[in-house]
């Protein structure tokens, strides 16, 4: 057995071993709980996106009615050809459709699930996915504003999506 400072070092390592192991176990459990919380928020986001997708068809008639009323108001006494009017209305309707944004939001949410489930280093990938999800949600919100009750419901769901994205981002700050 050694004497002096070497014996003290060995004693410290022997005493610290169990505490270090317990700390590692605690951090692993905490990481699992944070990942589960992130997955729960992502699941809620996916449910909101699915609901937006299911009610977006209801937004089309509301948008058409609003567009028709607005065009009638603007065109009273105007000499615009009906064919030209139909083309412009089709372009405007296409710009207000959120199907592509919903599809991309769902894809990003599935990628987020896979990333969290795989574990390991998430850093920049997680940041990128959350940024893209936020961008798609913002686009959905901007395209569906002002289309009546359907638009209000989509706005509620879009804001819920943004809230879940932010909660996932906050939880990600607790993961190393």
Across the structure, where does each feature detected by a protein language model lie?
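N-terminal intrinsically disordered, cationic/polar leader segments
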Residues: 1-176
């Amino acid at each position: 057995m050694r004497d002096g400072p070497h014996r003290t070092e060995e004693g410290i390592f022997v005493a610290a071993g169990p505490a270090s192991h317990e700390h590692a176990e605690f951090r692993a459990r905490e990481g699992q709980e944070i990942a589960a919380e992130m997955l729960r928020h992502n699941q809620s986001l996916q449910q909101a996106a699915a609901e937006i997708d299911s009610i977006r068809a209801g937004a089309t008639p509301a948008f058409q009615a609003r567009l028709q009323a607005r065009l009638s108001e603007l065109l009273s006494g105007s000499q615009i050809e009906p064919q030209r009017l139909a083309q412009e209305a089709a372009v405007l309707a296409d710009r207000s459709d959120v199907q592509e944004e919903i599809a991309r939001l769902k894809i990003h949410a599935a990628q987020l699930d896979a990333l969290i489930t795989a574990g390991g280093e998430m850093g920049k990938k997680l940041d990128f996915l959350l940024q893209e999800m936020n961008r798609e949600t913002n686009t959905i919100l901007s395209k569906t504003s002002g289309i009546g009750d359907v638009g209000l419901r989509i706005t509620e769901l879009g804001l819920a999506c943004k809230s879940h994205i932010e909660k996932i981002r906050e939880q990600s700050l607790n993961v190393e």
